[in-house]
Amino acid sequence: ESPGVSGLGILKGKVKRFPSDMGLKIPHIGWNFADIKKPCPIYDGIADGSFVYFVHSYYLDAENRSDVATKTEYGISFDSSVAVPEINLYATQFHPEKSGRVGLKILENFAKLGGDTLVR
């Protein structure tokens, strides 16, 4: 989000602001779909195209397309989550904690990845 400032260096790509010349409301706030692009354990039991809740002005443009787990449309198509299981990395641009039953299922799946035995 800060030009000239390096991120953590875990993922290759660019963080970009939504274009201001497209008439989009920025920040992007509200419900939108997540189009699942690859099998991912945090999306087990989640229907492709499920709606999730966003509040953001920036998005990741991942360099490695195989990292992209979901894409979403908001004036442009953007990477809305990434998954790199080999390094236990799962990241969403949307807010699972604000995404109703779908979000709760995503959080449950994530907890199970860590071996949480209290999850039903």
Positions of predicted regions on the chain:
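Hydrophobic residues at beta-strand termini and immediately following loops
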Residues: L11, T70-K71, T92
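Mobile beta-alpha loop/short-helix "lid" or hinge segments that flank ligand
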Residues: G13-K16, M22, G75-V84
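Cysteine-nucleophile active-site neighborhood
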Residues: E1-I29, E108
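Generic recognition of short, well-ordered alpha-helical segments
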Residues: S6, R65, V102-K105
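Acyltransferase
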Residues: P85-E86, T92-R120
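Phosphate-binding/catalytic loops
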Residues: I26, W31, Y58, A62, ...
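Catalytic beta-strand/loop cores that center a nucleophilic Ser/Cys/Thr
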Residues: W31-A83
